[in-house]
Amino acid sequence: YPHCAWDFLLYVARNIASSFATIHEHGHVVGDVNQNSFMVGRDSKVVLIDSDSFQINANGTLHLCEVGVSHFTPPELQTLSSFVGFERTENHDNFGLALLIFHVLFGGRHPYSGVPLISDAGNALETDIA
């Protein structure tokens, strides 16, 4: 949305955060947080379109999310070779949510994609996040 007004972008960010809160209130986790999980309408309404990888708590039976996009994965999970058998938390989602909001407000940029001021940074987003 390069031509959208700031207030529109703030409403979109708020609506994405609200969708995460609703999912969390029901005991579930988004898990595979990424920029392709949502569609945004002209009225700033947000629609979830990628829910097949949610971590679902169905009356005490936990159905895990076994996939994820590394650019939206929190630092403490960057070293995992696989998400198979790993239980995610709301806090893991919140890291991805913060990145999504940053993307919305700053033209699709990732907060770890800036120009590094030290020589060993900037080779890969995953290592910069970790």
Predicted segments — roles?
Residues 36-78:
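Activation segment/activation loop of eukaryotic-type protein kinase catalytic domains
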Residues 77-91:
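Conserved end of the kinase activation segment
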Residues 16-23, 101:
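Conserved hydrophobic alpha-helix
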Residues 1-12, 61, 67:
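Conserved structural core of kinase catalytic domains
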Residues 88-92, 101-130:
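Conserved C-lobe activation region of Hanks-type protein kinase-like domains
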Residues 20, 24-41:
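Catalytic-loop of the protein kinase fold
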